[in-house]
Curated annotation (Swiss-Prot):
Protein name, UniProt field: Calcium/calmodulin-dependent serine/threonine-protein kinase
The keyword Transcription belongs to this UniProt entry's keyword annotation: no
PANTHER family membership: SERINE/THREONINE-PROTEIN KINASE (PTHR24349)
The organism of origin for this protein: Malus domestica (Apple)
Record InterPro entries: CDPK_Ser/Thr_kinases, Kinase-like_dom_sf, Prot_kinase_dom, Protein_kinase_ATP_BS, Ser/Thr_kinase_AS
Region (Calmodulin-binding): 318-328
């Protein structure tokens, strides 16, 4: 399927960057095949960065070029490790996307792959362009948000998962930012995307299992047990919980504590938020968040559930407080995603722990986001791009302001 005789630039005009990851960048592309502007096809081009060959490794960071042999050895090891992981993730995503093209596409709820190119810069996946925005971005902008809308989201994700699972594909990293609307229309289909961490039967490298977003990771994945299609159903249960409450089911002051809560399936519906909901959606969440994966419903079974179908989901507008919390959660998620992507592109293994300790599990309010933006503009020497030390300084300043605010209110804050 990989085309080595054609150049990507000959087929597509490549324009703005749509997103970045630790090992990839996504740009918008416009087909050059048609002379008519109305017939031109817009696509998303995901470039998976080619890892360096062992005989031609990337340059070591400046601090490792000194005469400190321990420092040099450690940096060399981490560099080789990063190259190895990049190679695994690149190979894995191509394998999974090929399987999707063969057995799933076209599907209204799974992103479509049009073509693949390879050159000295890496492997380029030409994908269906989803211009309707991320799942939570769309929801927080809606004038009216109800259980019916949440059920429609779950239904579309379940439809996509059912098709993937029938082909023995497990997504492994299902989360809101990996669910995008195809366009800006009201009835736009919701597409599952980003299969870099997905698995195909027994053919996936074990390294892939080391990654994933902690909020959505299943107990069996945390315990390094067998990850199956039921692991995706756990993630969907977490998404549904957030859709109906505005916050995740597992909230803790540290990742270790959060992992323990996930392993024990320790969540509740005690807060006043849940008093306005009938039993059915809560029972559905409880079934999806069973610690025993065998007790969770499959995606196909979910599509027969009365609430998911929309028969028992209520049309009443949800409390404004839920939408407000969802906005805060979404803003915090974006900040952390940008921070982690920044770390992956620099000192991936050496600095992540320090950065996570700064970010914690804080729930950013609109005024805090505005303050944080202001601090970045003051602190960043080079304008838009922050160094890690500048980022650390801004986060510390945010935490200091929050502590002052908490002391003035003289009341505990939920982290």
């Amino acid at each position: 399927m990989i085309q080595e005789t054609r150049r990507l630039a000959d087929e597509y005009e490549i324009s703005e960057i749509l997103g970045r990851g630790g090992f990839s960048v996504v740009r918008k592309g416009i087909s050059r095949k048609s002379s008519s502007s109305s017939d031109k096809t817009d696509v998303a081009i995901k470039t998976l960065k080619r890892p360096f060959a062992p005989s031609n490794p990337p340059p070591l960071p400046p601090h490792a070029r000194r005469n400190d042999q321990n420092s040099f050895a450690a940096a060399a090891f981490q560099t080789r490790k990063q190259v190895s992981i990049s190679n695994v993730l690149l190979t894995n995503e191509i394998l999974v996307m090929r399987k999707i093209v063969e057995n799933v596409s076209p599907h209204p709820n799974v992103i479509d792959l049009y073509d693949v190119y390879e050159d000295e810069n890496g492997v380029h996946l030409v994908l269906e362009l989803c211009s309707g925005g991320e799942l939570f971005d769309r929801i927080v902008k809606q004038e009216r948000y109800s259980e019916v809308g949440a059920a429609a989201v779950v239904r579309q994700i379940a439809q996509g998962l059912a098709a993937l699972h029938r082909s023995n594909i497990v997504h492994r990293d299902l989360k809101p930012e990996n669910c995008l609307f195809l366009d800006n229309t009201v009835d736009s289909p919701l597409k599952i995307m980003d299969f870099g961490l997905s698995s195909v039967e027994e053919f996936t490298d074990p390294v892939v299992g080391l990654f994933g977003s902690i909020d959505y990771v299943s107990p069996e994945a945390l315990s390094q047990g067998q990850v199956t299609s039921k692991s995706d159903m756990w993630a969907l249960g977490v998404i549904l919980y957030i859709l109906l409450s505005g916050y995740p089911p597992f909230i803790a002051q540290s990742n270790r504590q959060k992992q323990q809560m996930i392993m024990a399936g320790e969540f509740s519906f005690y807060e006043k938020t849940w008093k306005g909901f009938l039993c059915q959606p809560k029972q559905l969440i409880s079934s999806l968040l069973k610690v025993d994966p065998d007790k969770r419903p499959s995606a196909q079974e979910l599509l027969d559930h009365p609430w998911v179908v929309g028969l028992s989901a209520r049309e009443d507008q949800m409390d404004a407080e839920i939408v407000s919390r969802l906005q805060s959660f979404n803003a915090r998620r974006k900040l952390r995603a940008a921070a982690i992507a920044s770390v992956w592109t620099s000192s991936i293994f050496l600095r992540t722990k320090k950065l996570k300790s700064l970010l914690g599990s804080y729930d950013l309010k609109p005024d805090e986001i505005k303050n944080l933006s202001s601090h970045f503009k003051k602190i960043c020497v080079k304008g838009d791009n922050a160094t890690l030390s500048e980022f650390r300084l801004s986060c510390k300043r945010l935490i200091q302001l929050r502590l002052v605010s908490m002391s003035l209110r003289a009341e505990p804050a939920r982290l």
